Amino acid sequence: MLALSPATRDGCDGASEFLDTSCGFTIINPEEEEEFPDFADHGDLLDIIDFDDIFGVAGDVLPDLEIDPEILSGDFSNHMNASSTITTTSDKTDSQGETTKGSSGKGEEVVSKRDDVAAETVTYDGDSDRKRKYSSSASSKNNRISNNEGKRKVKVDWTPELHRRFVEAVEQLGVDKAVPSRILELMGVHCLTRHNVASHLQKYRSHRKHLLAREAEAANWTRKRHIYGVDTGANLNGRTKNGWLAPAPTLGFPPPPPVAVAPPPVHHHHFRPLHVWGHPTVDQSIMPHVWPKHLPPPSTAMPNPPFWVSDSPYWHPMHNGTTPYLPTVATRFRAPPVAGIPHALPPHHTMYKPNLGFGGARPPVDLHPSKESVDAAIGDVLTRPWLPLPLGLNPPAVDGVMTELHRHGVSEVPPTASCA
């Protein structure tokens, strides 16, 4: 059985064009040599094929076609060569197929690399465009900032000389009638603008207004003090020296005593002044001569009142506390006995417990011992030299002893046992 299969290929325009024609022979039963003779023994294949049998059409129906056999034989040989080339290419070994696949993979890699390069080029182009836009926006922003800085007013440093000239111009024109343009003309300063002068004039008026208000308030207080106050300090018409009304006396209570003004402190030459941090201290050698010998003043604290000692468990004296939420009332006399209520009878004598806490009288401490006590301590040391010295006594220095001996006329001192 002879099968002819034309191969078609689609072009770019979508139309199918016949590029080549391949003829293949399929042998159904190769053992039957009678049905399929060898075509190689016969000459030309076209001479053997009967086209009338193939198409099944009578010869008188078809028109007479005169075809040059040489053309047909040449075209058919070309088609056979092309089909054999295609068949040989399709029947390559596995290794050749793998090589072809590798080559096709390389081609795909090359194509992919080209695509990547193209994409990177596009990306670079986009980045460059973005950078151009960013640079243009940054330059425009810088230009805008520079223009704004140029439009801003330069801050003026108002020196004392400049402020003095400003005040002179304002006083000449009047504080309420002064205008920035006239002040600028009178000052004659070229570095100032009308805006600078107007701002400084506003601040000057506000500050001057506050100063005038404070001066008026101080003058008002001074006037009231002179009207209602008395320089001698006496209470006149119920008013004190500072102008305030004295408190009226309460009904049923005596008037409050006048407040005594403390006299100025009297400085005596024999009292030590109060030491202030940072001032030089007084020499300690003259301290015994500075401080006079005196006793501490007696305490003015009153002792606790006596209480009755009783064995009754019903009554307990309260020493340091009182009943909460009740006023403290001093009981001077004992309450009379009531029938039915046991009362503790006082003993024949009362017990007074002195308060040894704070405020009680203590024996005076002699800060400066007398000469007799000092002589007694020295005599005790001389009689018992093996005992340690009492507190406050230090052994004399050798230089001091020698000086004292020379002062008394002793010039020669026998050597001690250690020196011998």
From Swiss-Prot:
Q: Where is the composition biased (Basic and acidic residues)?
A: 106-117
Q: Where is this region: Disordered?
A: 74-152
Tell me the compartments it is located in. Nucleus
SUPFAM superfamilies noted in UniProt:
Homeodomain-like
* Pfam families per the UniProt record, alphabetical: Myb_DNA-binding
DNA-binding region(s) from the entry:
150-209
Q: What keywords are assigned to this protein?
A: Activator, DNA-binding, Nucleus, Transcription, Transcription regulation
Tell me which tissues or organs this protein is expressed in: Expressed in rosette and cauline leaves. Expressed at low levels in cotyledons and shoots.
Deletion: any effect?
Answer: No visible phenotype. Pale-green seedlings in double mutants glk1/glk2.
Q: Where are the transmembrane segments?
A: none
Instruction: Name one cellular component (GO) term.
Output: nucleus
| Induction summary | By light. Repressed by BZR2.
Keyword Cell membrane present in the record's keywords: the answer is no
- Its predominant location is nucleus
Bias regions of kind Low complexity — which residues?
135-147
- Role summary: Transcriptional activator that functions with GLK2 to promote chloroplast development. Acts as an activator of nuclear photosynthetic genes involved in chlorophyll biosynthesis, light harvesting, and electron transport. Acts in a cell-autonomous manner to coordinate and maintain the photosynthetic apparatus within individual cells. May function in photosynthetic capacity optimization by integrating responses to variable environmental and endogenous cues. Prevents premature senescence.
What does the further note read?
Plants overexpressing GLK1 have a delay in flowering under long days, show high constitutive expression of genes encoding disease defense related proteins and are resistant to the pathogen F.graminearum.
Task: Give the multimer and partner information.
Answer: Interacts with NAC92.
Protein name stated in the entry: Transcription activator GLK1
